[in-house]
Amino acid sequence: MAEKDEVNTLRARFRGFYPVVIDVETAGFNSGTDALLEIAAITLQMDHHGWLKTHKTLHFNIEPFPGSILQPEALIFNGIDPDNPLRYAVTEREALYELFTIVHQGIKDDDCHRAILVAHNAAFDHSFLMAAANRTKIKHNPFHPFATFDTAALSGLVLGQTVLLKACLTAGIPFNTSEAHSALYDAERTAELFCELVNRWKRLGGWTKVTTSSIHSV
């Protein structure tokens, strides 16, 4: 039975970074002006054999920030009605405060130094997360300000697919198109996909042992 030593840790595998899968649904493409409407986050953990798997899940429907723009075509695309009281939406600050608290604890528990966002077409999700963090002025944002793991790029390399649906199906992960464009569902599939990509590389012998001294902060 493999021991969970320095090799079989998130810290060692990702160079001190704590990966968190994020998916957002928005009211447009401009993170500075268009509303963030939904966010889901899934933390990851590594077992004693070094296999990556999902851990905790968070999900929030979010109230449009004051003065934000709601692009009609975006709302049609994701099917979100921002005025629906059954969304039980919270403010950006409430959502990010809880998310950042959980992530900070995960960083501490796994002896990492910073979180890194994992997403499909990560630049989009990262831009909205950073914009919301700047608006809410929450101190100590745990996420790296520019580095990400993009499962679209990784899937293109490993699977020859860049669309989330096609990448999941190619990787043997079921995908229900009727549930797509929900932040929670897409985050769950993206997390499964990222774990499969990392674990597949390990199965192929692509992940070699490292020493503690080789792990440096950015």
Curated annotation (Swiss-Prot):
It comes from Baumannia cicadellinicola subsp. Homalodisca coagulata. Its cofactor is Mg(2+). Belongs to the RNase T family. Binds two Mg(2+) per subunit. The active form of the enzyme binds two Mg(2+) ions in its active site. The first Mg(2+) forms only one salt bridge with the protein. Homodimer. Mg(2+) 2 binds at residues 23, 25, 181, 186. This is Ribonuclease T. The record marks 29, 77, 124, 146 as: Important for substrate binding and specificity. NCBIfam families: RNaseT. PANTHER family: DNA POLYMERASE III SUBUNIT EPSILON (PTHR30231), RIBONUCLEASE T (PTHR30231:SF2). One of its GO terms (molecular function) is RNA exonuclease activity, producing 5'-phosphomonoesters. The keyword Magnesium applies. Its EC number is 3.1.13.-. The active site is at 181 (proton donor/acceptor). Keywords: Exonuclease, Hydrolase, Magnesium, Metal-binding, Nuclease, tRNA processing. Mg(2+) 1 binds at residue 23. Residues 20-194 form the Exonuclease domain. Trims short 3' overhangs of a variety of RNA species, leaving a one or two nucleotide 3' overhang. Responsible for the end-turnover of tRNA: specifically removes the terminal AMP residue from uncharged tRNA (tRNA-C-C-A). Also appears to be involved in tRNA biosynthesis. Pfam families: RNase_T (PF00929). The keyword Magnesium applies. GO terms for biological process: DNA replication proofreading; tRNA processing. GO terms for cellular component: cytosol.
